[in-house]
């Protein structure tokens, strides 16, 4: 196939070089257009007239002339094929000449080649390809071999389905099919044609048979040295038209039991039928149809089973192991997240413990500095040489009982109080304090904790100044009150000033 395409490209390049070397003159173009116009205007003209007009074209090569079209039809026409030839071919193939003549106004030259590389003639356009009957597929129509070999049309271009035209071969088609119909006539239509041929029923016209060549050998297609098309890379072969609707698969392959334990609850499988290790492929096709099954189906039929049981079980085991690993990873991640939360809580607990330790240390410092002094005992500061010992109760303590150190402040001695308490059956802590330890009554004219009574002393003036400074009065009024306080001399005036100041502050 690659050699044929290279040969076609070479012929096209030669045609282009010939046109560049000897450009077509305007006179030759006008004569050619006039000849084609006469052919379209005179349907009864024979082939000889067409050949004479063709010979009259000065210096035009055959492949170059096939590209010249009529201005009236708007599309190129086939060289050397008049309406008379079209009528003859139409009558031979059983097609009415009226329809063929109506469709011949916009014909375009196409060339089709079979698998042997020989050109198939008798083509009008892509929508009405008619091929003469013949078993060898080498029928000849008008145009000659030179025209088909030197054509500048690229036959190797793939169609919309990715197959080249040379892969399709040549097949005489019945009168009800066109070229586009052959590409889409799959399945039931081809099957019906094959059934009619096998039963011996001939087509309406003699010599009309459907001969589909066998598919090309994949080994031959893969031997090309340089790839022609980038899509196939010259290593994939076309296997014809695949009829997927006529193929029926066999039994479904069974899967082996997985050795791993299922993660979820299982389902009963008592009603499951027994498995089938292998089943042959059921197909409905004949070797003469030209339709082949897919390469995968052929390899599976030759090799045996669709899947290797051991490989399939290994893949399933690997998938199960990966799923188990993923599940374990998810559990580990969840535990790590919980650990992170616990870490934050532990940090907060540590901070609280540190704060409590600081508070306890502060309390211990305060408790160690507490001293309870008991009056009446101790050394006289004026007589440091006295033989009086320190009171043992003079030590850091938190509290003491209410009866301790009362003997030193009462009038009666301790021995007499104990004897009297024993005779009465109870110990009495009541007694009269000595005069030196008794509190004197509070005087109303002297400053005490009960109230402030100003006098002419400097202490009273200092207290009044502190009251003025700590008040919420304005600065101007504070300065004014300070000036008045300095001017006051008597005790009565100072007492009145104090009363006035308290009224101003309390407002």
Swiss-Prot record:
The modification Phosphoserine is found at residues 86, 151. Pfam families: Paramyx_P_V_C, Paramyxo_P_V_N. SUPFAM superfamilies: Phosphoprotein XD domain. Phosphorylation on serines by host CK2 is necessary for the formation of viral factories. Gene3D superfamilies: 1.20.5.110, DNA helicase RuvA subunit, C-terminal domain. GO terms for biological process: DNA-templated transcription; viral genome replication. Residues 361-377, 396-410 are annotated as: Interaction with the L polymerase. Belongs to the morbillivirus P protein family. This is Phosphoprotein. It comes from Measles virus (strain Ichinose-B95a).
């Amino acid at each position: 196939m690659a050699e044929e395409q290279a040969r076609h490209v070479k012929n096209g390049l030669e045609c282009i070089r010939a046109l560049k070397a000897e450009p077509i003159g305007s006179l030759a173009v006008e004569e050619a257009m006039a000849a084609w116009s006469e052919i379209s205007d005179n349907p009864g003209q024979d082939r000889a007239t067409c050949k004479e007009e063709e010979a009259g074209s000065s210096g035009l090569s055959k492949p170059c002339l096939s590209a010249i079209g009529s201005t009236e039809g708007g599309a190129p026409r086939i060289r050397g094929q008049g309406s008379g030839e079209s009528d003859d071919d139409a009558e031979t193939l059983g097609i009415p000449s009226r329809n063929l003549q109506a469709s011949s106004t916009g014909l375009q030259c196409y060339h089709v080649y079979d698998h042997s590389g020989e050109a198939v003639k008798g083509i009008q356009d892509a929508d009405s390809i008619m091929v003469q009957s013949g078993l060898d597929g080498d029928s000849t129509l008008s145009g000659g071999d030179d025209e088909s070999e030197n054509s500048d049309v690229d036959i190797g271009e793939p169609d919309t389905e990715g197959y080249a035209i040379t892969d399709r071969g040549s097949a005489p088609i019945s009168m009800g099919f066109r070229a586009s119909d052959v590409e889409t006539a799959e399945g039931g239509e081809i099957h019906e044609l094959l059934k009619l041929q096998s039963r011996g029923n001939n087509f309406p016209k003699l010599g009309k048979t459907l001969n589909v060549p066998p598919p090309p050998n994949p080994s031959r297609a893969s031997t090309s040295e340089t790839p022609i098309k980038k899509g196939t890379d010259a290593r994939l072969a076309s296997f014809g038209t695949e009829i997927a609707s006529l193929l029926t698969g066999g039994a479904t392959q069974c899967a082996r039991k997985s050795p791993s334990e299922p993660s979820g609850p299982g389902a009963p499988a008592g009603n499951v039928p027994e498995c089938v290790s292998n089943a042959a492929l059921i197909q409905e096709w004949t070797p003469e149809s030209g339709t082949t099954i897919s390469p995968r189906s052929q390899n599976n039929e030759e090799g045996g089973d669709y899947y290797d049981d051991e490989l399939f079980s290994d893949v399933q085991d690997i998938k199960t192991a990966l799923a188990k690993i993923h599940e374990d990873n998810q559990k580990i991640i969840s535990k790590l997240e919980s650990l992170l939360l616990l870490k934050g809580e532990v940090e907060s607990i540590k901070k609280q413990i540190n704060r409590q330790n600081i508070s306890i240390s502060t309390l211990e410092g305060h408790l160690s500095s507490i001293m309870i002094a008991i009056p009446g005992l101790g050394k006289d500061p004026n007589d440091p040489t006295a033989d009086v010992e320190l009171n043992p109760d003079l030590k850091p303590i938190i509290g003491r009982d209410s009866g301790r150190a009362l003997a030193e402040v009462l009038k009666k001695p301790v021995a007499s109080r104990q004897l009297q308490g024993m005779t009465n059956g109870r110990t009495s802590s009541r007694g009269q304090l000595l005069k030196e330890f008794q509190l004197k009554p509070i005087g109303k004219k002297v400053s005490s904790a009960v109230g402030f009574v100003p006098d002419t002393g400097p202490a009273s003036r200092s207290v009044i100044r502190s009251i003025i400074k700590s008040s919420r009065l304005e600065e101007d009024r504070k300065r004014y009150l300070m000036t008045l306080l300095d001017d006051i001399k008597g005790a009565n005036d100072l007492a009145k000033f104090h009363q006035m100041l308290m009224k101003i502050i309390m407002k």
